[in-house]
Structure formats: C-alpha cells, structure tokens
Amino acid sequence: MQSLDFDQRPILVFWESTRACLLACKHCRAEAIEQPMEGELSTAEATRFVDSLTSFGRPYPVLIITGGDVLMRSDVFALAQHARDLGIPVGMAPSVTPRLTDERIAGMRDVGVKVVSISLDGASAATHDRIRGVPGHFDDTVRALRRLVEAGFQVQVNTAVMKDNVEDLPGIVEIMKQSGVGIWEVFFLIHVGRGRDASELSPAECEDVAHFLFEASAHDLTVRTVEAPAFRRVVAERKEGSAESDGRDPVRQHYALGALYDRLTTRLYGLLGPPVSHPKAQTSGTRDGKGIIFVAHDGTVYPAGFLPIALGNVRDQPLSEIYRHHPLLRDIRAANFEGRCGVCEYRNGCGGSRSRAYAHSGNALAEDPACGYTPQALALER
C-alpha cells in the first residue's frame, strides 16, 4: 500500500449508503434514524457513483459500504455486485440487528464481499449494551462474529474506545481470539454526532492505549487505528526500541507510561498469556483525505466520516476530481499543518487526526490535541 500515490487515488472509499439504523449508539458519528433520510442517493445515482470510481484508474480503491445499517438499503447487494463486476473490491459494515439473517449473510458472500466489519464496544453486556443502546446486543454481536467467520468472511472488529470502555479492551481481544477474528480496528472517539455525549481519552491515556495495542498485536492480531495516527509513531518507536534493548524491558527502558497501560497489559497477559507472534500492528500512512475519502448518504464528499467539511458532491462531479484537486485535501496530503503537528518529524507518516483538530479548534490543519508527543524541533528549544 505504501507504493500508491495518494495524491492520485485513495486506498479506501467509504460510502455511507444510508443513515437508517435500528441502533442508538451513544458515540455514533451519524445521528442515526430508523427510516431512510430524504436525499439519499437513488439506485441510479449510486450506480453512477460506483461507475465513477473507475476514473481513479487501477488499482481501484476498495469500496467500503457502511451506514447507518447497509442492510436497510434494499439495493445494496445489487450495487455491491455491480462494483465487483467492474473489478472494484467491496467490503461491508452491517449492523447487528434482526436484519442480519443467514440469508443476508449468504447474500453478501454471493456478491463477492470478502471483508465484513462488525462493531464490538465492550467485553461484557454491561458495557457493550450500554454503548449500543439495545439490551441483549452484546450476545447477538458475539454470535454474529462467529456466524460470519464460519461463513468464510475475513471479519474485522471495530471498537470505539472512550473512557466508558477503555478497561474492556483486553477482554475484547479475548473474545476476538475465541471467535476466530484476526483484524481489530480501534476508533479513538471524536466529539461528533452522538459522540459529543461520550468521553474522549486524555493524551496520556491515548499514549497508554497505543502502546497496549502494539502489545495486543503480538497475539497474532492485525491491529489498526482510526483517528489515532500517532499509533504509527508508537509502532516505529517500539520497533526501534526493541532492536536497541539491552535486555531490560524495552517498554520501561524507553517510555514513561501510566497506570492505564499497566492495567491493560497485565489483564491482556492474564487472559491470553505471553505473545505468540511478531507484532502485527498495521500502518499505511493514510489519514483523513490522504488515501481515505468519505461519501455521505446524500452524495456529499468529506475528507473522512468524522471531518464534516463538505468538499463537493458526487451528483455534480466525479469523486476522483474532488479527491485530486480540492485545496484542503492538497494541504492535508502535503502535511501543511499548524502547531506541533506542523513541526513534528512524524508529520508525513502521522500528521495527527485532522478530524479531532477540527472538532476542537474549527481548523482542520491545527495540531491534534490528543497527542502528547513533543516534536524534536520543540524539545531542542527548551
């Protein structure tokens, strides 16, 4: 993935096919509703949008069909099949509701969907059901994970981490391992949508969680983050620190981590034992608007699902034109940032969360307030 020219094409195109969803998750980016919203792309408009993805040229980006709940769209399988017929890879992110039947699971497989992502936000019903807003949803989700694995999908668990559930992270890893899930994508909460009512982690807690995720990836688990690009710095530091270790614990030799890290790693090793693989933390150098682009239910294009700055609309112009030429996206890809992010030696590989910068300051190019790292350029001034 590193060889792709992100100025020309993204790796992933997220399409919010609908906002309709039966759940009421407290951290959701969308203000989800139970009926389709007026203005959603029609089948014909959605087909033209899918067709336009070929204008990026090969290799085509992966189309991730999300929502709301993708299964609330009656044409979603036909649209996925159309994308596959064009050679566009497709992933889906269905909600765990009564609509996720065995028939629809088979339907996803029949139209060529290979990767399915499911949200799991707690290691117990007490945590997960409180966040998802539906009693019994935790048990349904664990069953859904196992059903999808048994159906042959590559299954990814999405977890939105916040103060309400951060202590559950080791238990979520255990559930994933027991269910045969090999990919974990951890979303660091942003104050948008209903997420305004949930609690973001502090910079120190974000650092502790990032180091914990690196540890978790050594349990034969591919780990990625969303809106926490500083994880890439942590991965680079940890790999370098391990290589330089003099035999002492490289984490304690190189880093000043807090009690949260200690609790999470102690719990992880208590549940799963020592590492069983080399760390599989996955970083690709993408960020909002760089390798990633988001198309909303009404065709409006945003740098990412958590960055509500409208860039254009696929009803009016091809997505490739918006992605390649919009001034904000050019600035993001050129790492033209302000504050600490602007002088940081990791600004190209990391670059901070543009969504979080905007949510806190109204400026998408400002520094990421969740990062506690002091760039070398600033450290030398002290």
Spans of features found by a protein language model:
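Short loop/turn motifs at secondary-structure junctions
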Residues: 24, 58-59, 112, 180-183, ...
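Short, acidic, Ser/Thr-enriched surface-loop or helix-capping motifs
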Residues: 295-296
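Flexible mid-to-C-terminal extensions adjoining Fe-S/redox cofactors in radical SAM and related proteins
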Residues: 276, 283, 300-301, 305-382
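Conserved alpha-helical substructure of the radical SAM core
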Residues: 1-115
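Radical SAM enzyme [4Fe-4S]-AdoMet core and its adjacent flexible, acidic
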Residues: 36-37, 89, 109-111, 119-121, ...
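Structural motif corresponding to alpha-helix initiation and N-cap regions
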Residues: 43, 73, 99-102, 125, ...
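Residues embedded in well-ordered beta-strands within globular domains across many folds
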Residues: 64, 117, 185, 224-227, ...
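Short, small/polar residue-rich loop motifs at catalytic or cofactor-binding pockets
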Residues: 286-290
